Design a protein with these regions (language model features):
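Active-site-proximal helices and loops of the catalytic beta/alpha 8
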Residues: 29, 40, 420, 430, ...
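Loop/helix patches that line or flank the sugar-binding groove of alpha-linked glycan CAZymes
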Residues: 301, 317-336, 583-586, 592-760, ...
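Aromatic-rich carbohydrate-binding modules that target alpha-glucans
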Residues: 102-155, 165-192, 232-254
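Substrate-binding/active-site clefts of carbohydrate-active enzymes
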Residues: 300, 304, 312-499, 519-531, ...
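C-terminal beta-strand-rich structural cap/linker in extracellular carbohydrate-active enzymes
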Residues: 159-160, 778-797
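Surface-exposed, short loops/turns at beta-strand junctions within beta-sandwich domains
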Residues: 79-84, 152-156, 259-266
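Solvent-exposed, low-complexity, repeat-rich "mucin-like" stalks and linkers
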Residues: 22-59, 206-228
Length: 797
């Protein structure tokens, strides 16, 4: 089955380029492609940027390769029952490059449904297919009345339902179900990990000489007698094969040797080991003029620690523009409350963000919004304003309640002076009906009324690329309007050039076709990144399965998206005392498989679209609680238990020690609570406005952020799980500079545990980064006592 590959590693995207683009070279680091069982079609521009794609593919014994020059695609079909990791070579501009490709066969699992009668159509849908109601049809092949389908699944927890003659039904044969937040339930199935040969490629460290650098690795698997063979190693220097003569093998130890010109500039080294049709993790080492990432002032996008600000709810720095909209049915929480760009500037100058430790600000949309209140379409039809910034009526003007364009430019300049970056929130999906674009170019937008007479409103899955969010919010039709496509991609680039900002958070990504993101990123690379040697970070928002999210994450589209699949497992894991960290670890491993260890995906605890963590932790709301909207207006949560702050600190310790980019939503650092929109967007509080628990939370969150900033293994390291159960999650992250062990205890009781660290690490001293204590391990065993609802972060030397 031919399809565009949805599972491409997103780790180290344009930021991990080999060097600033030179003529006739590829600057993007080509990411590994996860192949499907049959055939996979890849758009070459999703792999790397080039002015011309005059490529010639070199035959490979493991794959049938078909290059469609007209469509700029390559069709890859595995042959000879190949599994594992390999590279496909191609020539471009008299140079040879490699595409890493990975083939892994997954076990299939059977789902069955026995209806009472004879339905016309039965479909399976769930988290594993982004809740698509059509693409997993179930069949009754033998006429016994039982409809069946087998699908490949990784270990993990999956919510699902059956779609029977246009009705959603839970699995009657499965008693395990959970609320879905929409007044109904989803069935739940857990796929446990099977016993298999567990392989891991460890980093052992580096050895620097005057004009040479050795990088050492160690391959571990269940068969202790198995030694590494040269043909089992896949090693890349940027996008080229690492010279075989510079690879040393001693039993299970591997050394990559670099010297001379190979050490100049910015480079990425990648290595993995194949064995019996399986491959190890891929280790990546970033170099800047021979210095390993984390040992110099050179920064990449992996160093980002993002702080999300909703302008109107952050800080009022200019009271003269604090003008709420007047309407007799409008409540305060849905109106403007005074925050502005000057308020953000004030907090930058005050040093708030420096002290907190964040280095990147994602700021909600600053474009001009309507001055009128509008009523939401769904019941109970409350009135809102555009205080949030997502009702744009201009493509170039700044909202007057927030400031003006000069202030926006000054804010970026001030942030850069303080060593910080600015990400604008960009809305590409829609405009407000008052926007002149809608009045002057109605043909740029989709139709509100569907051919069957229904309104195309909030049909998020059925009409994903055309649905309107409200009757007064026209959705662009980029598929049928090349003029709209050109205008809005040009406009996004204009914002970057005009303000000198560092990237975007993109709204509603899955409701915008891939062609938009491909054209935008092409323009950003050709007009900004390459000529200015500047890394632009683009992170998107997509609610859906991991395949759908990943379909937008590659070198030709976005650097990242928010990792909602990981979030959806993490929240109940931390808050339900009976939930096991094992399921969270399954999802973590799935994330690595799709996006890589060194990915740029955004990890969150809260967002402006989510119920705040503290509302759950304090017991005000259950996960997917259908009362959340009512609580937001009529019974706003408040924090009643001091223990809830400890639960938040534990989650923040997790958030700030895992791979990816941590995203702090304003108020997270003080333990702000809130139900659903707009209660999760309360006005931020500072200084003496905080109680003692909030002040202590702010202090500890800041300490955790600085631990991440100070330790490169937490930004560039691998991930090795040592323990995951109902109480403890312990994982070790290593890069060429150091090893950091994180231990999380969510139990109500103190825990004493003995952790076994790989003996090849040869640990001599353990340094507790929380309290400064040091102790010696017993060979490769660490005996640790950890209080209830607490974390430990240990530096292993």
């Amino acid at each position: 089955m031919k399809h565009i590959s949805l599972l491409m590693f997103a780790a180290l995207l344009s930021v991990l380029s080999c060097s600033p683009q030179k003529q006739n070279t590829i600057s993007d680091l080509i990411q590994p492609v996860n192949l499907s069982e049959d055939s996979t079609t890849i758009l070459l521009s999703d792999l790397f940027y080039a002015e011309q794609y005059n490529v010639k593919f070199i035959p490979n014994r493991n794959f049938k390769i078909s290059h469609n020059k007209k469509e700029n695609t390559v069709l890859i079909t595995p042959i000879n029952n190949f599994t594992g990791l390999d590279v496909i070579s191609f020539e471009l501009n008299n140079a040879t490059y490699e595409i890493p490709v990975k083939q892994e066969f997954k076990k299939k699992y059977l789902f069955t449904y026995k209806p009472a009668g004879k339905p016309k159509a039965v479909n399976l849908f769930g988290q594993f297919n982004s809740w698509n109601r059509q693409n997993l049809p179930m069949k009754d092949e033998n006429g016994d009345g039982v409809y069946e389908i087998s699908i490949p699944l990784d270990p993990g927890r999956y919510e699902y339902k059956f779609y029977v003659d246009s009705k959603e039904l839970v699995d009657p044969a499965n008693p395990v179900k959970v609320p879905n937040g929409m007044g109904d339930f989803n069935s739940v199935r857990v796929i446990e990990e099977e016993n298999k040969d567990k392989m891991f490629l460890h980093v052992l460290g580096s050895k620097k000489k005057t004009d040479a650098l050795d990088l050492k690795f160690y391959f571990e698997n269940s068969d202790k007698s198995n030694l590494v063979k040269p043909e089992s190693i896949v090693a890349l220097y940027d996008n080229e094969k690492f010279p075989s003569g510079n690879i040393g093998i001693n039993g299970r130890e591997i050394t990559l040797k670099l010297n001379g010109e190979k050490l100049k500039g910015n480079h990425a080294l990648r290595i993995a080991v194949n064995r019996m049709g399986n491959c190890s993790n891929i280790q990546t080492v970033r170099l800047n003029n021979g210095m390993i990432a984390g040992t110099s002032d050179y920064k990449t996008l992996n160093d980002n620690i993002i702080y999300c600000i909703m302008i109107d709810r952050f800080f009022d720095g200019d009271t003269t523009n604090s003008i709420p909209i007047k309407h007799d049915s409008l409540f305060t929480q849905a109106n403007y409350e005074g925050g502005d760009l000057k308020g953000i500037e004030d907090k930058i100058e005050e040093g708030y963000f420096d002290k907190l430790g964040v280095n990147t600000l994602w700021i909600s949309p600053i474009v001009d919004n309507t001055n009128n209140a509008y009523r939401e379409y769904p019941a109970p039809h409350r009135w809102y304003t555009g205080y949030h910034g997502y009702w744009p009526i201009s493509s170039t003007k700044v909202e007057e309640r927030f400031g003006n364009m000069n202030l926006a430019k000054d804010l970026v300049k001030l942030a850069h002076h303080k060593g910080m970056k600015i990400l604008w929130d960009y809305v590409a999906h829609h405009v407000h009906q008052e926007d002149p674009l809608f009045k002057e170019h109605p043909d740029w937008f989709g139709k509100l009324k569907l051919p069957d007479g229904r309104l195309n409103l909030r049909l998020f899955d059925e009409y994903r690329l055309t649905t309107w969010f409200e009757p007064y919010m026209p959705s662009f039709d980029y598929t049928d309007s090349p003029e709209a496509l050109k205008y809005m991609t040009d406009n996004a680039v204009w914002w970057l050039k005009t303000t000198d900002a560092d990237g975007f958070r993109h709204d509603a990504v899955k409701h915008v076709p891939n062609k938009f993101w491909r054209l935008l990123t092409k323009k950003i690379k050709s007009e900004i990144e390459i000529p200015e040697n500047k890394n632009i970070y683009q992170i998107g928002e997509t609610f859906g399965g991991i395949d759908l999210i990943a379909s937008y994450v590659n070198n030709g589209q976005l650097n990242a998206q928010f990792n909602f699949n990981l979030y959806d497992v993490a929240i109940p894991t931390f808050l339900n005392e009976n939930a096991s960290f094992r399921l969270l670890d399954y999802q973590m491993q799935k994330s690595f498989q799709v996006f890589g260890y060194n990915n740029l995906m955004g990890n969150i605890m809260d967002s402006h679209d989510k119920i705040r963590y503290m509302a759950y932790a304090d017991g005000d709301l259950e996960i997917n609680d259908g009362r959340a909207s009512d609580f937001a207006w009529n019974n706003p949560p408040r924090v009643d238990h001091s223990s809830s702050y400890e639960k938040l600190k534990l989650y923040m310790a997790y958030l700030l020690t895992i791979p990816g980019v941590p995203v702090i939503y304003y108020g997270d650092e003080i333990g702000m609570t809130g139900a659903s929109d707009p209660d999760n967007r309360r006005m931020m509080r500072f200084g003496d406005q905080l109680n003692e628990y909030e002040k202590e939370t702010l202090k500890e969150v800041s300490r955790l952020i600085h631990i991440r900033k100070d330790h490169s293994a937490l930004r560039y390291g691998d991930f090795l799980t040592l323990q995951s159960d109902e109480n403890i999650y312990a994982y070790l992250r290593s890069d060429m500079n150091e090893r950091i062990l994180t231990i999380l205890n969510k139990s109500k009781e103190a825990q004493k545990l003995v952790l076994t660290v790989p003996s090849v690490y040869n640990i001599k001293i353990v340094h507790d980064l929380g309290n400064g204590n040091e102790y010696q391990p017993d060979k490769n065993k660490l005996t640790i006592e950890i209080p209830s609802t607490r974390w430990k972060i240990l530096l292993l030397n």
